[in-house]
Amino acid sequence: MFNKFSKTFQYGRHTVKLETGEIARQASGSVLVSMDDTVVLVAVTVNKDVKPGQDFFPLTVDYYERTYAAGKIPGGFFKREGKQSEKEILTCRLIDRPIRPLFPAGFYHDVQVVATVMSLNPEVDADIPAMIGASAAMVLAGVPFMGPIGAARVGYANGEYILNPTKTELTTSQLDLVVAGTESAVLMVESEAQQLPEAVMLGAVVYGHEQMQAAIKAINELADEVNPVIFEWAPAAEDTELVAQVKALAEADVAAAFKIRQKQARSQALGEAWSKVKAALITEETETLRANHIKSLFKELEANVVRGQILAGEPRIDGRDTRTVRPIAIRTGVLPRAHGSVLFTRGETQALVSTTLGTKQDEQIIDALAGEYTDRFMLHYNFPPYSTGETGRMGPPKRREIGHGRLAKRALIAVLPKQEDFSYSMRVVSEITESNGSSSMASVCGGCLSLMNAGVPLSAHVAGIAMGLILEDNRFAVLTDILGDEDHLGDMDFKVAGTENGVTALQMDIKIQGITKEIMQVALDQAKEGRLHILGIMKSAIDAPQELSTHAPRLYTLRINPDKIRDVIGKGGSVIRALTEETGTSIDIAEDGLITIASVSAEGAEEAKRRIEEITAEVEIGKIYEGTVVKILDKNVGAIVQIMPGRDGLVHISQIANERIANVADHLQEGQQVRVKVLETDERGRIRLSIKAALADAPQV
């Protein structure tokens, strides 16, 4: 019934097993990947026919984490998984980025990759198994895919690289880097680091690429055993006559367009050049494939013009040389009521970045598959269509926005103050108001300055820069601070963020084979040069963290005996609720007894702090207190007197007066202020009070 194949290999300290032929047999290719109890099923499906009018490669990648994988039932009213989490979306992008450039130009068949996490070892993240599984399933689907690829996570601690570190190991690692590539070349890097030197970062990329060869070898061996059916597809034969026609119609216009420095005017000129080609070569009767081919030839012509100019040493599209950063303008304190804000403009890319400070209660609660946790630092990136002069849908963030926000967040994490030194939660929002390349790096620069404007004591300034590459045979040019067109027409998108001391985030996407270690070294060195230039400008705008905004909450902390926490909270939360309402504060209580009071008003916070100190103060035996009668007990037993907020004691009828009394109510009423002396507390914490003892101790007049 089943024709099963499997392949096992050692991957660092983990054992990885690839299985196929038993599950999801109707998919074009499917693989079950196991890595030390983390199990991911990856299925690839390819449509046999191209949709009419299709003019791009429709690859979709979806990654899902099922809660049963961790032995959990989803929380909330609906007991099933809902929309994808941020972690799932980021993993979709990790899988997609190294796979997409390995498909040939002109392949327009629908390809769908679905990765499902079915079992999770909390120590082994499912992203690396999912990437390996997607590569293997793609090979088994028989599509024209120039793979397989391998993927590896690299950590760095005590001067040594760690292959596929566990979750526990990552807590002490100075680096969390994911690298993917083919047998001969690196294709994708995603990382965050603790201000590491460029040499260490490059070494991690090379180390990861060397180690992933074990995964690539296993996939190839599995494919040899399975011997998959090859998908029938052949690239369109080169039509030299059509190439010549497109060139004759548009080359001069395209070359002239790329001499225009302003983006909108340049885009308009390129649009007119395309319209000229379209009018001459495409009619209503033209087949979709031919129309697509003409469009791709026009795009190829654009690339050839730009690339040829740069490799010939001519100025770039906007007139710069290869190493120059675009002009930068910085304005701080832009938004009067925001806790921190900065307008960061670099050429035609602009980000308006704001920072909001909050309390522990404002932290993001993340219900992850491996367990719930909170995050005190949030960075959200918004890319409205007006930023590129276009109209479009506004709504929930797209995958690209989530990915760019995560990259900017990675860049800043390394310089954030420790929780014990700065108790605030922090939310940074980057509104991209103009875009012509490198908006995520503008978010890094603006985010750093916005945090400092809000008074967050960052340990260093962080700047980010996007690098590009043009590679033809043995000639190459590394471009500093790339434009949007240079990103699309180049061979590499290489984003580096860091401080003066080292790299905090690195993201790389390579569209071609053949990027060598030497080229990456040149790119890193040139990126450092650009980063230091930007850091100098940023420091001239804000050289150190500023004073907290008057609109930001003030945090006050005190520590109490953990046994007293219940007294501060009160029965059913009555005490803390009254405290927050009456003082206008927000109060957070940690299990270790650390209390954080947040308030815009210093007076309210001080009052809350005073009352908490009263509540948690130890009752002293023999001390006299001013108390309030809160209850007259039935059967003439006595009265309950409150001597501190939340602390009551019993005054027995025999302790009310020196003489014998018959009725408690004749001497005491609820709300009456009385002086009482603490006689004793029992093992259950109950307090015995005496009015007559307090009278006896009163000074004689």
From Swiss-Prot:
Residues engaged in binding Mg(2+): D487, D493
Keywords assigned: Cytoplasm, Magnesium, Metal-binding, Nucleotidyltransferase, RNA-binding, Transferase
Transmembrane segments: none
Places the protein is found: Cytoplasm
CDD domains on file: KH-I_PNPase (cd02393), RNase_PH_PNPase_1 (cd11363), RNase_PH_PNPase_2 (cd11364), S1_PNPase (cd04472)
Cofactor(s) the record lists: Mg(2+)
Domain S1 motif: residue ranges: 622-692
Xref: InterPro entries: ExoRNase_PH_dom1, ExoRNase_PH_dom2, ExoRNase_PH_dom2_sf, KH_dom, KH_dom_type_1, KH_dom_type_1_sf, NA-bd_OB-fold, PNPase
GO MF terms held by the record: 3'-5'-RNA exonuclease activity; magnesium ion binding; polyribonucleotide nucleotidyltransferase activity; RNA binding
Catalytic reactions on record: RNA(n+1) + phosphate = RNA(n) + a ribonucleoside 5'-diphosphate
Gene Ontology biological-process entries: mRNA catabolic process; RNA processing
Record-annotated KH domain positions: 553-612
Entry EC number(s): 2.7.7.8
Top class in the EC scheme: transferase
GO CC annotation terms, alphabetical: cytosol
Protein family (similarity comment): Belongs to the polyribonucleotide nucleotidyltransferase family.
Role summary: Involved in mRNA degradation. Catalyzes the phosphorolysis of single-stranded polyribonucleotides processively in the 3'- to 5'-direction.
NCBIfam families the record matches: polynuc_phos, PRK11824.1
Name of the protein: Polyribonucleotide nucleotidyltransferase
Annotated organism of origin: Laribacter hongkongensis (strain HLHK9)
